[in-house]
Amino acid sequence: MDSPSSVSSYSSSSLSPSFSTSSVNSDFSFPSDNEREGKGTHELRPDTVGQRGGSRPSPGPIRCRHRPRVSSNQHTAPHLEQQGSEVKRSRDGEQETSLNTQGCTTEGDLLFAQKCKELQGFIRPLTDLLNGLKMGRFDRGLSSFQQSVAMDRIQRIVGVLQKPQMGERYLGTLLQVEGMLKTWFPHIAAQKSSSGGSRHQISKHFPSHHGDPGAASPAPLLEKMGQTQLGHLVLKPKQPWHLTGWPAMNLTWIHSTPICNPPLSSQGSASGHSPIGTGASIGVILVLQKGGQPFTHSAPGTPVPPTPLSPVVPGDLKKLPGEEPRCHSLPVTLPSDWSCILCPPVLPTTDREMTKGHPEPQMTSHPPVAPDPQP
């Protein structure tokens, strides 16, 4: 029977290898307590690998290192998808707003754009005034503060006129600016009203010549001669033009192109030929007929010295004995390249000629015939 000392030494020697192996295994091969709770299924694989391979390292810690990356990828993928959907929604919203903005064009916007187009003629004088303020042309009359305020106002007005897409929000301000501009530049406002009315009336019935530079120039005769001077010869702006329905007697019209003379051999009315040409001069023509064939006469090609003109009335023509009624037109300036056919002398236009009863001959295509000498 063994002694107690031998039993204790045997037990210590038999237990020491187990403790040493357990300590080595706990340091290198086994996971921690937290890893045991989460991944209990992988605990047996290191032992089996260690038993079979011996020196092969255990892949336990490596798997633990890759797992957070997989989880992060799983979290980032939905996040990227959410961001992509938000960007797509924002783009769709921008497209919808742009379509709504383009489609919402009200009558006020169109009226604002039309007003800006009508007031384009004031941009040039406003620019000249602004340049004069910058160059010091008004230093004596205005202080520096007044000049700076004036320049700021003029720049704002010009900026509004150059942006017709601003919309009806500023329509009231534009109407106030229009009244102010017409007060500052009355000659430009009058010129726009006269030429605009005549062009609007002509554009309804005659083709427009955009390529002709002369057609764009304002008519000088309408600016100088008013309705009081022309009298009954002036055609009202609202009166419709019916070329085919005009009679041959007492024909009155205002035309903005040179007169096209019909051939003298034609026995019809002179209204069959439309006064459409390439020039832009304006004349007033009165056609009369007394039982016979109508006479035609066009305006002279050279300007006539300014003399007081009196309107030609059919009643005054009867006072002249021995004179046949003719077609008479007021003198205007025609283009240099316009060839016109001139006929025998026309009726007198001044009071002096009417009292004498002998009209002075004007430029004609036939040589003037000298009167027979009285015995």
UniProtKB/Swiss-Prot annotation:
Residues 1-102, 192-218, 351-375 are annotated as: Disordered. Residues 1-32 have a biased composition (Low complexity). GO terms for molecular function: E-box binding; RNA polymerase II cis-regulatory region sequence-specific DNA binding. Disruption phenotype: Mice exhibit a longer circadian period of locomotor activity, alteration in the expression of core clock genes and impairment of the response of the circadian clock to stress. The peaks of DBP, NR1D1 and PER1 gene expression persists longer in the liver between Zeitgeber times (ZT) 12-14 hours. GO terms for cellular component: nucleus; PML body. Interacts with BMAL1, PER2, CRY2, BHLHE41, HDAC1 NR3C1. This is Circadian-associated transcriptional repressor. The gene is Ciart.
